[in-house]
């Protein structure tokens, strides 16, 4: 009887617990190529285009001859809130959204060499979500904590470009192996 009550209580708590819904993985894309993004990043297991090498080089053996070009438009909402605390000047909302729109290009080309080999290249990027805060409050008698006293703005930015020349070999109808050389800038 106690076990049934415990299981019932655990089930109720599990159903009442909030789920996590992540709209972004931060700097890194949840998928590369419009089809992979539309399928929640499933491109690693189900290649659909010549950007397959971004997540699984072997996938290039399954996409055939193709050229894919695109641009991702990324518009995140970024801010932070400091709850009331013992440092009143450090309370409030801080918006680090000077730049609102990020355009990330992507390109992929694949050429089948017979029925079981593919040679291609995928070019893609990571980034966006940069954050730049205005000069923050100076709570200790005018000592600016957020910029090291330099007068510059505090923030972060990450931009990455990957070029991945790829070779893939189809072992049979359902299996392939592949290798990419990831050249990153």
Where do the model's predicted regions map?
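N-terminal, post-signal peptide beta-strand-biased segments of exported outer-membrane/organellar beta-barrel
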Residues: 18-125
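Membrane-spanning beta-strand positions in outer-membrane beta-barrel proteins
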Residues: 66-68, 118, 166, 176, ...
């Amino acid at each position: 009887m106690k076990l049934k009550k415990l299981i019932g209580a655990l089930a109720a708590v599990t159903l009442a617990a909030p789920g996590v819904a992540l709209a972004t993985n931060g700097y890194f894309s949840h998928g590369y190529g419009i089809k992979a993004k539309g399928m929640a990043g499933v491109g690693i297991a189900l290649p659909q285009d010549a950007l397959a090498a971004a997540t699984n080089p072997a996938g290039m053996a399954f996409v055939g001859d193709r050229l894919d070009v695109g641009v991702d438009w990324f518009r995140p909402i970024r801010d932070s809130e400091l709850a009331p605390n013992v440092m009143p000047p450090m309370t409030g909302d801080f918006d680090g959204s000077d730049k609102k729109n990020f355009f990330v290009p992507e390109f992929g080309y694949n050429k089948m060499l017979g029925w079981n080999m593919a040679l291609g290249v995928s070019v893609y990027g990571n980034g966006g979500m940069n954050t730049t805060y205005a000069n923050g409050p100076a709570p200790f008698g005018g000592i600016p904590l957020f910029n090291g006293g330099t007068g510059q703005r505090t923030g972060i930015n990450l931009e990455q470009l990957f070029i991945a020349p790829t070779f893939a070999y189809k072992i049979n109808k359902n299996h392939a192996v592949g290798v990419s050389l990831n050249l990153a800038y």
